[in-house]
Swiss-Prot record:
UniProt GO MF annotations: calcium ion binding; integrin binding; protein homodimerization activity
Upper classification of the organism: Eukaryota, Metazoa, Chordata, Craniata, Vertebrata
Signal peptide: 1-23
SUPFAM superfamilies associated with the record: Growth factor receptor domain
Record-given protein name: Fibulin-5
Originating organism: Bos taurus
């Protein structure tokens, strides 16, 4: 029939053999004695033997045995022939009818082996290895597994049976691997991402501590899950390669990091001060050293040491020019009885002061006022000389006082001498006179 395989049903004769010494009968393998009829009946091994066929094989009962065939193979059963209609087949010569006292031969082994077995040279029924003899019907994609009295068609690990074919199982679809999975025919392999190593179970991945094994960083290595990062010591910054560290030039970040000068060093920096200053505890600010107070100056005995920001000045004693007379260490007076003093200021008072270079403006830097106020008198304040650059002006702040104002920033070092004149006018007694403060201004080199 088209589409079917004809499976030959083997008819096996069941011989009822008397047991020597008594009249009890015995059947060959694959048959059981029916005591009611005295006949040998076929044993259905497919029902009595647990898992007679394994895998995707189907058990087909045969007379005196059974057959394991693929489930996909259709079976056509031929006409059943009763083995008991003629207890002796044509293949076996008919035995002579027994006499009244037959002499039965002693039979220790069956003469016929059931299906799936064959008789060896010692008349023993041994299993037929269908897999070794290539007498199985397994598909080329399957493997043959021999069983007692038959065989089973199965698939190797990594394959499953689908419509009679062994198809590869894609283990990667089922998450067998923790990270990377590569499917191969009949198997799979797990791998790990960079920074991980495969554990002994072949599936899970463990982080690699690169800092402990390689220490790829120049300075500090910090392990992370699956990787690592490099860090630099204070004063260094990480380069673009993520491994090396280069010195950080802190001085380039801001011009206000140090009050005077910032000196960069590998991994750090420090502030320095110019001569005449010391660095304060904040390590950035500079403070003037008072050389005069600490007697760290070069002035001679006749000179006066005047401390400046960042230095000092050795001031000579004042010299009063004719017709002036020196009346103190810092004052010259022109006597009223001297005719040459008529148009001259009555007194010249010497004063010294210092300002830092580039001081912000406008700035009130000096105060001037009359010591005595006369009835009917008023006062005029002005810069008599020394203001050629128009960097100062006098602002009268009251009837008898005025303030010297610096209007432009002055860059040092520089020495300036201004004659500040106070004119006294008294209309009651028709008097007009003046006095001068000779102000010497020392501008330091630095703005601190």
């Amino acid at each position: 029939m088209p589409g079917f395989k004809r499976i030959l049903t083997v008819t096996v004769l069941a011989l009822c053999l008397p047991t020597p010494g008594n009249a009890q009968q015995q059947c060959t393998n694959g048959f059981d004695l029916d005591r009611s009829s005295g006949q040998c009946l076929d044993v259905d091994e497919c029902r009595t033997i647990p898992e007679a066929c394994r895998g995707d094989m189907m058990c087909v009962n045969q007379n005196g045995g059974y057959l394991c065939i693929p489930r996909t193979n259709p079976v056509y059963r031929g006409p059943y022939s009763n083995p008991y209609s003629n207890p002796y087949s044509a293949s076996y010569p008919a035995a002579a009818p027994p006499l009244s006292a037959p002499n039965y031969p002693t039979i220790s082994r069956p003469l016929i082996c059931r299906f799936g077995y064959q008789m060896d040279e010692s008349n023993q029924c041994v299993d037929v290895d269908e897999c070794a003899t290539d007498s199985h019907q397994c598909n080329p994609t399957q493997i043959c597994i021999n069983t007692e009295g038959g065989y089973t068609c199965s698939c190797t690990d990594g394959y499953w049976l689908l419509e009679g074919q062994c198809l590869d199982i894609d283990e990667c679809r089922y998450g067998y691997c923790q990270q990377l999975c590569a499917n191969v025919p009949g198997s799979y392999s797990c791998t790990c991402n960079p920074g991980f190593t495969l554990n002994e179970d072949g599936r899970s991945c463990q982080d690699v501590n690169e800092c402990a094994t390689e220490n790829p960083c120049v300075q500090t290595c910090v392990n992370t899950y699956g990787s690592f990062i490099c860090r630099c010591d204070p004063g260094y910054e990480l380069e673009d390669d993520g491994v090396h560290c280069s010195d950080m030039d802190e001085c380039s970040f801001s011009e206000f990091l140090c009050q005077h000068e910032c000196v960069n060093q590998p991994g750090t920096y420090f502030c320095s001060c110019p001569a005449g200053y010391i660095l304060l505890d904040d390590n950035r600010s500079c403070q003037d050293i008072n050389e005069c107070e600490h007697r760290n100056h070069t002035c001679i005995l006749q000179q006066t040491c005047y401390n400046l920001q960042g230095g000092f000045k050795c001031i000579d004693p004042i010299r009063c020019e004719e017709p002036y007379l020196r009346i103190s260490d810092n004052r010259c007076m022109c006597p009223a009885e001297n005719p040459g003093c008529r148009d001259q200021p009555f007194t010249i008072l010497y004063r010294d002061m210092d300002v830092v270079s580039g001081r912000s403006v406008p700035a009130d830097i000096f105060q001037m006022q009359a010591t005595t106020r006369y009835p009917g008198a008023y006062y005029i304040f002005q810069i008599k000389s020394g203001n050629d650059g128009r960097e100062f002006y006098m602002r009268q702040t009251g009837p008898i006082s005025a303030t010297l104002v610096m209007t432009r920033p002055i860059k040092g070092p520089r020495d300036i001498q201004l004659d500040l004149e106070m004119i006294t006018v008294n209309t009651v007694i028709n008097f007009r006179g003046s006095s001068v403060i000779r102000l010497r201004i020392y501008v330091s080199q630095y703005p601190f």
